[in-house]
Amino acid sequence: MSNVFTHINADGNAHMVDVTEKAITEREARAEAFIEMASTTLEMIMSGSHHKGDVFATARIAGIQAAKKTSDLIPLCHPLMLTKVEVDLEAQPEHNRVRITSLCKLSGKTGVEMEALTAASVAALTIYDMCKAVQKDMVISQVRLLEKRGGKSGHFKV
C-alpha cells in the first residue's frame, strides 16, 4: 500500500490523477453498507406492505444508477465505462437491519472502488428515504470496501 495521496500534487493541491499511460486491465470492487431499523419497519419492507412500493427494488436501481454517476458526485473520480453493476439487499431480521452489497466491474485504467462504495451507500440512503415517514432514527453504518482486484495495487480483501 502506498503512503502517498495520489490526488494531491507536489504543490499540495487536489488534482485528477493522470491515467493516460496506465494499462487497461480487468478491475472489480465489492462494497457493503448496513441500515439498521426497528423490527416493525423491517417487517414492513419484507412483507411488501410499504405504501411506496418495493423498497428493495427501488434501492437496487438507485444503487446501480449511483455507480454510473459516481464521477458526477465525487470531484476527482474519472468517468468510467462500467461493464457490470450488481446491488444485492439482504434483510437480516435477527439484527433488525438490511445488508447491502455491491459489485462493480470494468476493463479500464482505473479502479472501481468508489463506484462500488457509492452504489452501496446510495442504496442505503434510498431505503432511508423510502422509510423515513415510518421511522426517522434508522442508522446507516459500516460502509466499506470488501474487496478489489486488478490494477497496480493488486488484490485487497478484508
Swiss-Prot record:
Pathway linked to the protein: Cofactor biosynthesis; molybdopterin biosynthesis
Residue positions of the active site: D129
Record field: transmembrane: none
InterPro entries found in the cross-reference section: MoaC, MoaC_bact/euk, MoaC_sf, MoCo_biosynth_MoaA/MoaC, Mopterin_CF_biosynth-C_dom
Keywords carried by this UniProt record: Lyase, Molybdenum cofactor biosynthesis
Residues the record lists as binding substrate: L76, C77, H78, M114, E115
Annotated EC: 4.6.1.17
CDD domains tied to this protein: MoaC_PE (cd01420)
GO biological process, one term: Mo-molybdopterin cofactor biosynthetic process
Pfam families: MoaC
Gene Ontology MF term list: cyclic pyranopterin monophosphate synthase activity
KW NAD (keyword) present: no
Record has Lyase as a keyword: yes
Catalyzed chemical reaction(s): (8S)-3',8-cyclo-7,8-dihydroguanosine 5'-triphosphate = cyclic pyranopterin phosphate + diphosphate
Assembly behavior: Homohexamer; trimer of dimers.
Role according to the record: Catalyzes the conversion of (8S)-3',8-cyclo-7,8-dihydroguanosine 5'-triphosphate to cyclic pyranopterin monophosphate (cPMP).
Entry similarity comment: Belongs to the MoaC family.
Cross-referenced PANTHER family: MOLYBDOPTERIN COFACTOR SYNTHESIS PROTEIN A (PTHR22960)
Protein name, as recorded: Cyclic pyranopterin monophosphate synthase
Source species of the chain: Shewanella baltica (strain OS195)
Gene for this chain: moaC
